[in-house]
Amino acid sequence: MPDPRTFREPAPGTSRVTIRDVARAAKVSVSTVSHALNDTGTLSRDTRERVAATAAELGYQAHPMARGLRGGHSGVIGLSIRALDDTGTYRADGAHHFERIAGAAAVAALESAFGLMLIPYPAGPSLERVALWADGYIIEDPVSSDPLVTHLQNANIPLVTVGWDPSRKSKTAWVSTDGRRHTTEVLELLRGRGARQVTFISGTERNSWNMQSEAAYRAWARDHGVKPQLIRLPAASGSAGGQSAVATLLKNSRTPDAFYCQTGRHAAGAARALLDAGLEVPRDVLIVAGSDAEECRTSPTPITALDLRPEHLGREAVELLVSIVESRQVKRQRLIEPLLHLRASTER
């Protein structure tokens, strides 16, 4: 066994010994210490005893929340909304979708005797601490091979995603809309109203929503013999990003018959660029948004949009996670039907 005395213990009056201190002294990972002290996982008896002895000699005491987990449940669900972290602010304009998910999830958690805690999307070393305190996690819009999903799976922590991780759709529990099918339905709506060349404005994040919708757009363009015209913009670019991208497109190429924008803010920006160019919606160009937002409803010409029903997504995610935490046998992959709000931007 490594001699714990080679590790410098905190002096009296300083911060207490942490699980990381134990891991360094025992020359194992933080997750190994957690499994050893909580009698979980598949560690050998020798490893468990070695870690326990190191912890005892250092005087390590588990954090109260970790002790709660050792005896059962903490009664807490963690919610990480990756898309908000990607914007760099939690007060982003157009964040209503995520606020609606979080609000509905909080109420649903309380109804199941759990508390909901919003956490920043962890990265780097902070991943090691994530799995120690919550009974389970909800991750909104994970990207392909998402490191947080990987970390929680490796730690055997229950998780549900809103939208699936594209690299392991069949291996995780999720609630989601069917981006591929609904994108095709919107494109057919536009085609039925006279649009042949449709420009698609998607996000840059490699999540299931963007990837499925883009795949559907390319397939639709191929099936109808039209050249795809795809613009990718970061969601954080908002209305200004949509306005700038469409203004540039109008200067450099033929005006398309319609725009299908993944986000409501991009759609609102596209509408402003069309207006600035002397074009009228819907007379000259049709617009649809793939996610309804206040900007769609208050645009000078209200914009047709898919309502992804974020409250329903939030409630379903909590219900599914609680079922998994409580070891109930339930369907672990659930599709939610969005609603299409027809507005003036597609009236012909």
Map each language-model feature to its residues.
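Hinge/beta->alpha junction and helix N-cap segments in small-molecule ligand-binding domains
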Residues: L84-G88, A92-H97, Y121-P125, V175-E185, ...
